[in-house]
Amino acid sequence: AASDVYKRQEDDNTVARQTMPSPAQTRFVLTGNKNAYPYDEFYKDDDELTADIVAAYRQVIADLYAAGCRNVQFDDCTWTRLCDKSVRERLGWSDEDAARLQQENLDVINAVIADQPDDLVINTHICRGNFHSTWLSSGGYAPVAAKLFGEENVDAYYLEFDDDRSGDFAPLAEVSGDKQVVLGLVTSKRPELEDPEVIKARISEAAQYVPLDRLCLSTQCGFASTEEGNKL
């Protein structure tokens, strides 16, 4: 049966998850490069495009839910671009542009999440890029923490914290409600293994901002987000 598609992949210790680009990621790719994606002949403005992105995501998620999926993850590189001053300067974004983009990210994501079933978990992975052990952007989460951690209505954040590019844990103080935070303290970009005592110490540091029972541990990103993989 169609509703068994995801259940067949699960057991007592495993939950099947469907990952996809964040609605904000899709919107950013389309609106940020109109030469590559000329949608003006279809939409009179960005608001019409955004409405269709929201409708498409909601339909896809409804179909996934009908197929038995109860865990969806949005992979999102848009927020970290806003954390990196050099990226903002290269793209010509003023402080006002950055504030507007944060709100646009938040609005499209929350519109997709609104009124979803109570037993559907929606998480997000905030990514700085992961290509052949390189990255797209750097910088701590402070510039986006209030909107991202305080107002995005996901159930959990998967965050990269494997090196100095990620900044410190202080922005986690903005995490609202009972959301979980998955600390990406284990690198997937380099072959060296972490010192377990260092990992424990960093978890204790993060627990100053988010209670320990809402913290989890993971790799910072995938081991092979593209076919080239990483240099491991």
What kind of feature is each model-predicted range?
Residues D12-A16, G68-N71, P117-I122, N153-D155, ...:
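Short, well-ordered coil/turn segments that N-cap beta-strands
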Residues C83-A98, F131-Y141, F169-V175, D195-P196, ...:
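Short glycine/threonine-rich loop-to-helix capping motif typified by GTGT followed
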Residues E96-N105, A111-D164:
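Long, well-ordered mid-to-C-terminal structural blocks that present hydrophobic/aromatic surfaces
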Residues Y37-R58, R90-I113, P143-F149:
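Acidic, His- and aromatic-enriched active-site or binding-groove loops in soluble protein domains
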Residues T19-E41, A67-R100, H125-H132, S218-C221:
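Active-site-proximal loop/short-helix segments
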Residues A2-Y6:
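Short, small-residue-biased leader/transition segments that mark boundaries at the very start
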Residues P143-L232:
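Catalytic-face loop-and-helix region of soluble metabolic enzyme cores
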Residues R8, L64, T124, L148, ...:
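Conserved, mostly hydrophobic/aromatic
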